[in-house]
């Protein structure tokens, strides 16, 4: 596959969508420069938005060994489309849209890992792909792994080779961002790797292609309690009206070029141009002899049907695109502060997210990703939080230890049914964590929340196990299987 070359208009049409940087009110000073992002997907194409004017793809690896390089000259397959769209949505520079449809991390470099085998994606190949990223993290300085796909089996993390690989990647300093899935309308929760406790699982929302935040509504992402008892997703990002590339070298690519030329033409040009482009645009034979108004009506109807927003882009939907948008925010955060750990990044993302007040909390986690605020907090985060520091309460020497992180808080307390919901103050230690401990209350299931600055009650950002609090929110849950009081 050789990158496509172009010498024609890249103009958007009247169905154009809001570019992602504008949609998220992102800080344009941060572009992901100096950050390497790995994408695990079905397949890829060396799209001009990734390789022009400079090829930013550092490496390509095919787990199945079907395609040795992106420019090996093999046929363009349907499964190349998905990975091309996800990688461009996050890191594309908008070359084929004159910069309009660029990702937030449009100066990041990429490592592309294909995990499909003749179009099929198996659990073993996904795990192999993650392990390859771990093994090559130092060689390419990989900081982020985006996974916009999933396995087939709904199993606990401890029994999933995919989840185990994802958790291992995080232990090695790689931020893992995963799509939640698109089956929430059927009441389904996330499965591997989106159920993995330490990954950042991303659900979706729609702003109906409007900049007014009041238009936000949730997408039908997978949500709820997983087989391990954790609640996913942690955050949501745009999952509708996202500009993504049409795959070069395909029939639809040629057709949309022709249709876009027709849409951009003046009325007096349309009849002659319709005759010239009849085959390429797949126009009905009788349309060629119609007047300009009829031709234009047909062309615009087809562009709308195909979701074409510019000559080489269409709008897409799904958490497959919400995840790379969050990945691009993470790239900006790491550019702003390269010392950030996966634990710190996840903590910042959930603590800066904005909940949609009209939607159920369990479907959106901590809410809508706030790109600008996350980068601001990343700039000033002085602490390198390890994974342990951002995990659920744990038992040490017969005492239950609670940990919370918020550099802007002036006071933090914990309250739960283990202490009749009385506020127990936490103290800030030298590593930037608020901590306290209590005598282990015995075996059982306990609910709790943190209270920040005496007013804000929030669930534990480091604990995925939650339960409804009966007032529209969630309590965090800790389960103690052993009665430590008798040890």
Regions found by a protein language model. Give the residues of each.
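Solvent-exposed loop/turn segments at secondary-structure junctions
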Residues: 43-46, 63-65, 96, 116-120, ...
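Subtilisin-like serine protease catalytic core
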Residues: 24-61, 71-124, 138-143, 171, ...
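Substrate-binding/access-modulating region of protease and related hydrolase catalytic domains
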Residues: 115-198, 208-209, 227-230, 307-323
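Short beta-alpha junctions and helix-cap segments that line functional grooves
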Residues: 25, 98-100, 162-166, 186-190, ...
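Extracellular S/T/G-rich loop segment that most often corresponds to the catalytic His/Ser-adjacent loop
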Residues: 41, 61-62, 194-327, 331
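N-terminal domain-start motif of subtilase-like serine proteases
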Residues: 1-39, 49, 67-80, 215-224, ...
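Aromatic-rich carbohydrate-binding modules that target alpha-glucans
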Residues: 391-445, 451-481
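C-terminal subdomain of the subtilisin-like protease fold in secreted/lumenal serine endopeptidases
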Residues: 11-14, 142-147, 286-321, 335-389
């Amino acid at each position: 596959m050789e990158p496509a070359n172009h010498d024609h208009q890249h103009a958007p049409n009247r169905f154009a969508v809001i570019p992602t940087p504008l949609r998220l009110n992102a800080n344009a000073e941060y572009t992901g420069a100096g950050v390497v992002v790995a994408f695990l997907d079905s397949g890829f194409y060396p799209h001009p938005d990734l390789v022009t004017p400079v090829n930013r793809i550092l490496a390509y690896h095919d787990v199945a060994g079907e395609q040795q390089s992106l420019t090996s000259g093999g046929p363009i397959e349907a499964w190349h489309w998905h990975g091309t769209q996800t990688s461009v949505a996050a890191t594309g520079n908008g070359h084929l849209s004159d910069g309009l449809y660029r990702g937030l991390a449009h100066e990041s470099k990429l490592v592309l890992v294909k995990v499909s085998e003749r179009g099929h994606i198996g659990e073993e190949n996904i795990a192999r792909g993650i392990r390859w990223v771990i093994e090559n993290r130092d060689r390419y300085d990989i900081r982020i792994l985006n996974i916009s796909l999933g396995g087939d089996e709904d199993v606990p993390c401890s029994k999933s080779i995919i989840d185990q690989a994802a958790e291992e990647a995080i232990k090695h300093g790689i931020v893992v961002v995963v799509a939640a899935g698109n089956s929430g309308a059927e009441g389904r929760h996330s499965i591997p790797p989106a159920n993995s406790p330490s990954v950042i699982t991303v659900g979706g929302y729609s702003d109906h292609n409007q900049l007014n935040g009041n238009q936000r509504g949730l997408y039908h992402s997978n949500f709820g309690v997983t087989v391990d008892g954790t609640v996913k997703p942690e955050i949501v990002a745009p999952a509708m009206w996202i500009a993504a590339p049409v795959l070069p070298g395909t029939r639809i690519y040629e057709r949309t070029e022709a249709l876009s030329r027709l849409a951009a033409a003046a009325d007096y040009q349309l009849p002659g141009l319709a005759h010239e482009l009849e085959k390429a645009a797949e126009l009905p034979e009788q349309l060629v002899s119609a007047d300009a108004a009829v031709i234009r009506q047909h062309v615009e109807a087809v562009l709308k049907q195909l979701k074409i927003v510019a000559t080489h882009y269409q709008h897409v939907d799904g958490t497959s695109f919400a995840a790379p948008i969050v990945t691009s925010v993470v790239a900006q955060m790491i550019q702003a502060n390269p010392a950030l750990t996966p634990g710190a990044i996840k903590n910042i993302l959930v603590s800066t997210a904005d909940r949609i007040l009209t939607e159920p909390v369990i479907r959106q986690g901590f809410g809508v990703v706030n790109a600008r605020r996350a980068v601001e907090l990343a700039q000033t985060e002085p602490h390198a939080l390890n994974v342990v520091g951002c995990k659920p309460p744990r038992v040490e020497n017969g005492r239950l230890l609670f940990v919370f992180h918020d550099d802007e808080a002036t006071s933090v307390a914990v309250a739960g049914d283990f202490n009749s919901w009385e506020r127990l103050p936490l103290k800030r230690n030298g590593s930037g964590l608020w901590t306290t401990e209590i005598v282990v209350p015995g075996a059982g299931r306990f609910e709790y929340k943190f209270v920040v600055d005496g007013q804000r009650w929030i669930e534990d950002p480091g604990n995925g196990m939650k339960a409804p609090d009966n007032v529209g929110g969630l309590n965090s849950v800790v389960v103690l299987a052993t009665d430590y009081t008798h040890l």
